[in-house]
Amino acid sequence: MWTTGRMSNAKSWLGLGTSLYFWALMDLTATVLSSTPMPEVELETLFSGRSQSHQRSKRSWVWNQFFVLEEYTGTDPLYVGKLHSDMDRGDGSIKYILSGEGAGIVFTIDDTTGDIHAIQRLDREERAQYTLRAQALDRRTGRPMEPESEFIIKIQDINDNEPKFLDGPYIATVPEMSPVGTSVIQVTATDADDPTYGNSARVVYSILQGQPYFSVDSKTGVIRTALMNMDREAKEYYEVIIQAKDMGGQLGGLAGTTTVNITLSDVNDNPPRFPQKHYQMSVLESAPISSTVGRVFAKDLDEGINAEMKYTIVDGDGADAFDINTDQNFQVGIITVKKPLSFESKKSYTLKVEGSNPHLEMRFLNLGPFQDTTTVHISVEDVDEPPVFEPGFYFVEVPEDVTIGTTIQIISAKDPDVTNNSIRYSIDRGSDPGRFFYVDITTGALMTARPLDREEFSWHNITVLAMEMNNPSQVGSVAVTIKVLDVNDNAPEFPRFYEAFICENAKAGQLIQTVSAVDQDDPHNGQHFYYSLAPEAANNPNFTVRDNQDNTARILTRRSGFRQQEQSVFYLPILIADSGQPVLSSTGTLTIQVCSCNDDGHVMSCSPEAYLLPVSLSRGALIAILACIFVLLVLVLLILSMRRHRKQPYIIDDDENIHENIVRYDDEGGGEEDTEAFDIAAMWNPREAQAGAAPKTRQDMLPEIESLSRYVPQTCAVSSTVHSYVLAKLYEADMDLWAPPFDSLQTYMFEGDGSVAGSLSSLQSATSDSEQSFDFLTDWGPRFRKLAELYGASEGPAPLW
């Protein structure tokens, strides 16, 4: 059975002080677990409070815990407690073993006596307790003498950690003029010590800096305003230092501090005020509408939305001539021109401008009216202005038959300045390119310069200029619109050529054609035309004219029995007159053709030649004749085609020396080069086609391209001869050093890809700075050997082909 040796340990601490000995007796116990219940023992309490009266109390020992103070700083190991077994006779036969958390590292045990010591500094904030196991063994045999027991060593807290503000420093805002006690912010400090033991973790708050403006609640850490009517405009920023002290703020407690930066936010507690009660401004009388005259400014000590201004003109004789707008960026009032100014009419204006806050707070209205006024004097300065027309627009109506030089309007302008300079008038020629009008330079009389024609130009829009004599740069202008009135100066006429048809079997009174007329004039009451036969045809026996009284007329026959063989065409002159003053008329001719018609009245033929054929020739006979002619034409074409495809003899006679050019026109060719071909007849010379004949050197500089013969070989022997001849000519051309290369495109039976040699015109001069390599010329054969020697990099001989 395990027993404790804690009583002797408590007595050994008597030298440390009576109170510590009492604390050790009451709170520090060491117990060991046992398989049997542990009896209650009586422990005499040596001290109780300050009365030091002796008392006796019963207490039940809890044998499974040890208590040890943290942060021990002595040089010797800290004694924790003692383990003892009832089977230990003190002869050293029992061996005590300690295992578990921190065994051998933090805690050690004397295996003979069972004394437990702490060999490292203990920190409760790092680890609050350790769980270990104890066992008693027979030293000689190693056999367990007691069952293994578990116990706990708890680390007793001491005040070794100061309070800390984990969220500091703090930033807070509170409105200015806030009542006393307004909450600003709450600060919180934490203490790492054990809050369940003593006062080590009990924190008390106090303010070290910031009085008398702010206070702090000692328990909650809430900061509040302590002074009324704190004005942001007087002081905006405050730095408050808060202290948190443990041990309930008692002497010896640890403390920590933090800084709280408090800003007073703005409220609208300051009315706007104009620092300048009178403004003097000036503006030119020629200033355009909305141009700026000047600026006024009302100062407001507030900021942001509380400093926004609104400017208005509340009084003055210039309220209708000027306007004021608020610049929201700079909170100034901008005075602008509202209507045109005139120095001659009014030389000065007075305005009363008010500046006010649009956003008000009711609780600060007692601080005074949140508006202010100022007076603005504006002087209008004289400028040299251009002449002004009265009225500002002219509309003139003039008949088109007005004579040249007639005055149609008097244009008037005057100088608005006090000097009243003389004025010269003119017409902007860009507005009157036809030069139909001119204006008197002095009087401004507008007159016609050319005949007017309403049918050509019915409206004229011109611009008349007025210029000061003393200052030609001052020019005024006015628009003049001239409407040309119509007079009856155009006769009516047919709108188109009329051609009518009449059947041979037409009856008297039959309608042939309805005609109408047009007139370029435009009378007020509209057009009205009158139709009749011309005087020279008044007694026409064939046709008559009936006026429909709606600007149209009908052409009717007077008789029947028209014959195409007798007269196939009639020309009927018709007189057309208008209703204008004076009356104008013209004569139009109606062409009437006589046609043969069937019984239904449909026109069959209007050509008189058909009646010249014999009467016995019917329509079927005529068709037969045309068919025979067509067959004969087909036979002729077949014969010509067969003759063109007739076979020619294989051998060309020596006497025949006919050459033809094969020209193809169904593809896109090369122009005149398409007419060039080869004379294949020359290839039939057997003397030059001999196999052993030496090639001749060409002496000409330009090869002649002859025409291609229309005879082609058709036997194998002939083909062999031609092939040999072509090879010989090819070899001769390749070996001829004097034959120049030709860069040309020949179109034969197809559209080719061009010359593989490229264009020699693209070769650059050897004296140029080009770094192009011309070594490829050596691969083009003997004809380009000279170029390869001149332009190639290699000096050696070109390869032979």
Curated annotation (Swiss-Prot):
PANTHER family: CADHERIN-20, CADHERIN-23. Residues 61-165, 166-274, 275-389, 390-494, 494-610 form the Cadherin domain. PROSITE patterns: CADHERIN_1, CADHERIN_2. This is Cadherin-20. Keywords: Calcium, Cell adhesion, Cell membrane, Cleavage on pair of basic residues, Glycoprotein, Membrane, Metal-binding, Repeat, Signal, Transmembrane, Transmembrane helix. Cadherins are calcium-dependent cell adhesion proteins. They preferentially interact with themselves in a homophilic manner in connecting cells; cadherins may thus contribute to the sorting of heterogeneous cell types. Residues 1-34 form the signal peptide. The lineage of its organism: Eukaryota, Metazoa, Chordata, Craniata, Vertebrata. The gene is Cdh20. It is a single-pass type I membrane protein. CDD domains: Cadherin_repeat (cd11304). Residues 60-619 are extracellular. Expressed in brain. Highest level of expression in the retina. In embryo it is synthesized by the forebrain, anterior neural ridge, developing visual system, primitive external granular layer of the cerebellum and a subset of neural crest cells likely to develop into melanoblasts. Its main location: membrane. Gene3D superfamilies: Cadherins (2.60.40.60), TCF3-CBD (Catenin binding domain) (4.10.900.10). One of its GO terms (molecular function) is calcium ion binding. The keyword Ligase does not apply.
